[in-house]
Each structure stands twice: as C-alpha cells, then as structure tokens.
Amino acid sequence: VEYRPGYIFQTSSFLAGDNSQWKPYEWGYSAHLKYSFQFKPNTCADRIYGSAYQGIGLGYYDFGNKEELGNPIAIYLYQGARIARITSRLSLNYEWNFGLSLGWKPYDEYTNPHNSVIGSKANAYINAGIQFNWMVSREIDLVAGVTGTHFSNGNTKFPNAGLNTMGLKVGVIYNFNRPKDALTKPLYQAPIPKFSRYLSYDLTLFGSWRRKGVWVGEGQIASPDAYTVLGFNFAPMYNIGYKFRTGVSLDGVYDASSNVYTIPGNGNECYKPSLEKQLALGISGRAEYVCLLYTSDAADEE
C-alpha cells in the first residue's frame, strides 16, 4: 500500500489558474494497492538481478478538480530492483510503473472548454522513481522515496499537453512467505555462473495512430483526421552480461501524418503527399538493461 503526494507542474494556463475555479492546481494525491512476486532471496537469480520484483498495481488520483479533470484510476504493471545495499536491512531501490489511466474528464468545446491538457478519457500512465526500502521484520517493509509521473494519450487525440507531477511516496509492504534468513547476511551464497556472451535477434512490429497540427499561414491548426503509423525494428543484439546488451537496429516507419499540408486559399483542408514522402528507413544504436521479465531500451537513431 502506498500514498503519493505530488506537485503538479504548471505547464499550461489551465493548470496555472485559467479554469472554472480561477485558481492554480498545484498538488495531486494518490493511493495505490500493489501485488508483486520475486525470486527466493539469496538465490542465484536474486543476486544477479538485485532482488528484482514485478507485479500489478491499482492507483486512485485526486488533482483537486473532479469537474474538469476527473479522479482517474490507473491500472499498471511495475518492476523494481535494488540499486545499492546500505545495510543488511536497508537498500536503495528503483521502480517504474507503466499502464493505463481511466476516468478523465477530457476537453470539450462546450462542456469542458478550459481543459487544455487532457483530450481523452483514457491516457497512458508512466511513473518512475527511487526509494529506500527498510526490512522491519520478516513480514513488514517500509518504503519512502521520490517519484515522477506523466499522463498523456500519445497524440491520439487533441489536446495532448499531458499532466506531469513530481513528489514523494511512502508505503508499507506485507511479505507473505519471506524466509527468516532474508533479514541477515547469509552464511552461504549461491555462486553466480560465468556469463557466456552471445548474439540474439529482436524483431518488433508496431502500429498506432496519431493526430497532427498542420501549418496554415503563420500558425498551426489541428487536423481533423487521425493518421495511421506502422513500423518495424530489427536488431541484432550482443549480450555482454546478465543485465546488459547492446547492438544496432534497422528501423522503418510509415507515418501517414508526415508532410501533410494545406493549400493557401483553399480553407483548412489537409492534403497528403506522395507515399515516398511518408516513409522513413534508418539505423540506430541500442543499449538495453535486462530486468528478468522486462528490458529497458535506449536508442540513438541516425
């Protein structure tokens, strides 16, 4: 169970006070219920991946404006692991969350005209932070740390300025079947086998849609259309160790919104260019941090 108070970044006039209540929305609060699982402490896998854990969570958010923003509920996967062990009972951990948030009050020209940050009832939920984890007893852990959160719909609907918070987190963890020796330094640790480096191949196919702002004169208008986005990544990856791999990727994408234009004197109608102006092919360098069931990917495209 966790409680997270957070500061709302004032990224729009709506959040700064241009709203129905004529006051800035500076603070948000959330409560979370989470369930996770992990390998048995002091095993080989537990030592390699820093006591990594993963699970599912449910969060309820209150931003102080139910009428214009709503009180969304987030459903998400999460994963975390130890960064450093400070004592036998105290560690510094990282954790990230990724999922879907539902129950927003989106922008509407007539019923919710001030809301310039959220354009859809469902939005992506992304959270990451670091925290101290103190093993109080065999059953109970206490956690405290800092965390950042982002909500947006990925340009699938306008407006999409999104909402961002930064704050604290405090929580209590109940462990159902943790061994007694998990709280002390073990007399024996399972040896970690030497890693044999090898080459693997990743193939990713993806598809989505997006909205786009189109230039008309000296300003932009929101195109009334939703545009298809399709693509692939093919990446040979060299596995350097248990937790890190790197390589290059061949990346291709078709973006139906690319180079969309208007014709002066022909209103706000949007036109698509020829197909070759909406295709892209390139290569990127990649590095991945492996976290048991998940990998964290960073890419530098050319």
Summary of predicted features, one role per range:
Residues 1, 31-37, 77-83, 96-100, ...:
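Residues on the lipid-exposed face of transmembrane beta-strands in outer-membrane beta-barrel proteins
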Residues 1, 52-56, 75, 90-98, ...:
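Transmembrane beta-strands of outer-membrane beta-barrel proteins
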Residues 1-40, 173-177, 183-237:
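Short glycine/proline- and aromatic-enriched beta-strand/turn motifs that initiate or cap beta-hairpins
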Residues 3-9, 37, 58-64, 98-106, ...:
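Transmembrane beta-strands of outer-membrane beta-barrel pores
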Residues 9, 42-44, 134, 138-142, ...:
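Repeated loop/turn-to-beta-strand initiation elements of outer-membrane beta-barrel proteins
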Residues 25-31, 69-75, 90, 120-126, ...:
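Residues that define the transmembrane beta-barrel architecture of outer-membrane proteins
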Residues 131-183, 187-196:
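Predominantly the C-terminal beta-signal and adjacent terminal strand-loop region
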Residues 294-302:
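Conserved small/polar residues in nucleotide/adenosyl-binding loops
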